[in-house]
Amino acid sequence: MSNNHPAKYTDVIVPVLAEYAQGATSILDPFAGTGRIFWLHEYLPGVRIEGLEIEPDWETDPRTTIGDALNPPWGPNTFDAIVTSPTYGNRLADHYKAKDGSRRRSYRHSLGRDLHPNNSGRLQWGKKYRVFHVEAWGAILPLLTPGGVFVLNIADHIRNWKRQFVSRWHFETLCAMGLTPERGRKVVTPGLRDGENRELRIGYEYVMKFRKN
């Protein structure tokens, strides 16, 4: 098992997620990774938190449910908050098998094997990435109660010297699926400093809050 997940929630993101989820009684992270969503208990004591993760080989928090976000094991209207950070479609989705000593990072390299076919960590930003996330949001949003909040942590990246507007696409897609935006914030983050375009890394991520009508 491995807890060397290359894209965990950063320390500065967690309190913003907690702020945006204030008032929730039940929270789901459908892309839970190693389980840092449970850090929200420090800010929101007494809240029920569930995490869903497709890769059992991540050293996940024992409270995490192993399963597929495309087919979540809960019924409609189970949670009054969804708090999550999907993959960003950046170079962490590379499938290369790094040689010893390589400083470049990817989900595959960190896990030490190929990813599950339904793991979006396999997908570079593009049509397949967008199709996957439309399907994923379509499976997850019914779990959210009417009036519930959806908190999204997402970031853009640079590819071939051009900014890829991943965050804008998620924002527009979630709005088109019936969510109403309420708040948003840029959060300065350290980010990764290895690999291609490292000198052009975007130094912040977005946290967005939506409400289900």
Feature locations, PLM:
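Class I S-adenosyl-L-methionine-dependent methyltransferase catalytic core
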Residues: M1-N213
